[in-house]
UniProtKB/Swiss-Prot annotation:
This is UPF0337 protein SAG0619. InterPro entries: CsbD (IPR008462), YjbJ_sf (IPR036629). Gene3D superfamilies: YjbJ (1.10.1470.10). It comes from Streptococcus agalactiae serotype V (strain ATCC BAA-611 / 2603 V/R). Belongs to the UPF0337 (CsbD) family. It holds the Pfam family CsbD.
Length: 66
């Protein structure tokens, strides 16, 4: 797992924990912040996955052109 993907997973977990704690305590602001952090981290993970897929496709094309 890449460093970026690991960081995204950890950030998702932290955001989810904040969101859950906010729900339990009734702290709507903390709940919202946690949700936002979790969502941003998931977006970063998806972007990293897309980058990896594009790099893999480019490498495959380069191999075929050799």
């Amino acid at each position: 797992m890449s460093q970026e993907k690991l960081k995204s997973k950890l950030d998702q977990a932290k955001g989810g924990a904040k969101e859950g704690f906010g729900k339990i305590t009734g702290d709507k602001e903390l709940e919202a912040k946690g949700f936002i952090e979790k969502t941003i981290a998931k977006g970063k993970e998806l972007a990293d996955d897309a980058k990896d897929a594009v790099e893999g496709a480019v490498d495959a094309v380069k191999e075929k052109l050799k």
